[in-house]
Amino acid sequence: MTLNLCVLTPNRIIWDSEVKEIILSTNSGQIGVLPNHAPIATAVDIGILKIRLQEQWLTMALMGGFARIGNNEITILVNDAEKGSDIDPQEAQQTLEIAEANLSRAEGKRQTIEANLALRRARTRVEAINAISS
């Protein structure tokens, strides 16, 4: 039995295909979803989406949103998303280093919050790449 997974951003469809299982980062932690999962609607955190096809796992960096799960259908609407295989490792590492530097230079509450969010997004992109190679 399979699940139909659809990952959408406001601009495009990132993924629309059948999968065996997913592991999703929510605001209350990670959840695993298998066929016949109980219906749920949840907020999606900045984090990694792991997708199992057959014996192969793929990763995707999600930048926050929400998910609806029910009747073996999973719809994830996020601000932005990238497949781990589409992320340039050098660019992601460079973005992470810039985000770390910006956080150390942040002045005031607003700059600190924005720098922390940028750092979380950058770390998620690097984690999506590293999860592929492990």
Swiss-Prot record:
InterPro entries: ATP_synth_F1_dsu/esu (IPR001469), ATP_synth_F1_dsu/esu_N (IPR020546), ATP_synth_F1_esu_C (IPR020547), ATPsynth_dsu/esu_N (IPR036771). The keyword Nuclease does not apply. Its main location: plastid. GO terms for biological process: proton motive force-driven ATP synthesis. Produces ATP from ADP in the presence of a proton gradient across the membrane. Belongs to the ATPase epsilon chain family. This is ATP synthase epsilon chain, chloroplastic. It comes from Amborella trichopoda. The lineage of its organism: Eukaryota, Viridiplantae, Streptophyta, Embryophyta, Tracheophyta. The gene is atpE.
